[in-house]
Amino acid sequence: MKLSRILGVVCLLFSSLCSRAATPPTVTIFVDATSAPRKIFHAKLKIPASAGDLTLYYPKWIPGEHAPDGPVVDLAGLKFSAGGKTLKWRRDLLDGFTIHVDVPAGENEVNAELDFLSPATFEGGFSAGSSATDKMAVISWNQVLLYPKGWKADDFTYVASLKLPANWKYGTPLPIASTSGESGETQITFKPASLTTLVDSPVITGEYLKVVKLADDPPTEMDIAADSAAALAAPPEVWDHYKNLVEQANKLFGAHHYRDYHFLLSLSDHVAHFGLEHHESDDSRVDERGLVDETARKAEASLLPHEYVHSWNGKYRRPADLATPDYQQPMQDDLLWVYEGLTNYLGTVLTARSGLLTFEQSRDDLAITAAMMDHIPGRTWRSLQDTADAAPQLYFAPQAWYSWRRGVDFYDEDTLNWLWVDVIIRQQSKGQKTIDDFCHLFHGPPSTGPILKTYTFDDVVNALNQIVPYDWRGFWTERLTNHGPGAPLGGIEGSGWKLVYDDNPSEMERGAAGNFHVVDGAYSIGLELREDGSITDTIEGMPAAVAGIGPGMKLIAVNGRQYSPEVLHDALKAGKDGNTPLELLVENTDYYKTYKLDYHGGERYPHLVRDESKPDLLTEIYKAK
């Protein structure tokens, strides 16, 4: 054989080996959720491998959670085998989400077994939170899988199957290949999907599960699991409002970027409460009576609109530094003022346009947001931009000292900022353009499946300038970096309204206090507390803080009488325009002390009132299209 021929054969063999080595693996995963009522999920995986060190990852940075909070602490029962023999493994000393497995020669597949321990009590946040009860569960695939090093999440193919408890139904956006089962137990085999799609497609399941069709083109539905059948019996107008939500959202954006969409809604007092976006679904969780109780329903009215908007803003359009290739590479949260802030604003708009809240309720809700942000003294040292930059820490910060530390204010403060943007667009264009035009340009046509298109700060500025030429870079730089004083109220004032305070709480204020079991003295004496008197925050510079009261203390008595919410309210009213100090007996780490507050302003609650000197743009913004 000639040398050239030999070299050619060698090159061909080398090329073939490299090609095989570079082929992304297909992983099979079986999840047994039949023990969900015990708060434990069992998983088995088959992972292609070769001799030597197999590096496996447990997902760390979960899209939408904006932090390295993958619930690795609840990964248990980890075992690996190949060829019928148990394999040794060790956790990486520099990264607890990385596992190294020693694969012997001659083996090309590793079997993995693991358990996920869902928190047994109401605790945790996002996919690390409580996710199962006796009657229902939510399976987030990132909880129950591993993936090998070396490829992007888009490159993997996962063939997944799931076994459910007897007589439990389910809902998911993940395409299904087949179902089977015996003795009431259901086993679902899903169509092969990329790891990206799998992690982005949770499953809701339960004994009491209701499916409500919202739209046909594309198919859109609510899959609602509850701890009781009674919790699913919402009045018919509720479903009408959610149908309106789908219609109004598609009008707002002018297109969609999903094949079908599933609102996955958990109704339980025993799972973690939050909303987490996915491209073709959302994982939202509220109180068991969150649909049937009118007060609870209003308190959480904007949750599903917010998560639905994320299908466009956050999933289809995403900051470039949040679009990482896998779940280990750190994400950068600096553009959360768009990802979450714009979403929050559009969510409030759609809440009003769909009828989930009336105009008056939406207006009162906006007043509460403005007042909250206007009582954040922490803005004097921490910019709005830093609340985004520090999001991985702030998401898990305690409630105590919130107003001085600041929290993830890019939600509420940017609701005000994006309202301001909407108002500027309307003013500069003499009513010819609105934020809807920006949404059409930035998030809109043509309709597609679940694809990703990234953006930068410059892209946002350029898109805004295409709608209305303006110093948008200067506007956002100022809004993100300034230190007050006070909240950005330009949007409210420019829309023809003013923030004022009086002694009558609005319907939304009363509802929030009752639903979340809090007493709000933030705008009077700067005191926030629970119904039992536990003080969650005091606002620096306001009477309670000036007197020496701080978070973690407990209010025992008011003006010599045992504390109750009503006693505090009555004392604030009685002290208005008087001369006698308000006396608060407070317990602090087993010690008692009476604090005297020189306050005589009565109760103060926020409202918006019309400024008749300006056009009423807010009513137009909230009007259904």
Regions found by a protein language model. Give the residues of each.
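Non-catalytic architectural context of zinc metalloproteases
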Residues: 34, 46-48, 63, 68-77, ...
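Early extracytoplasmic/domain-onset interaction patches
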Residues: 22-61, 142-143
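Sec/Tat signal peptide C-region and signal peptidase I cleavage site
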Residues: 17-21
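C-terminal recognition in membrane/secretory proteostasis and scaffolding
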Residues: 347, 357-625
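Juxtacatalytic substrate-recognition/specificity segment
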Residues: 210-336, 342
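Bacterial N-terminal signal peptides
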Residues: 7-16
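Post-HExxH zinc-binding segment in Zn-dependent metallohydrolases
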Residues: 282-291, 316-317, 328-381, 585
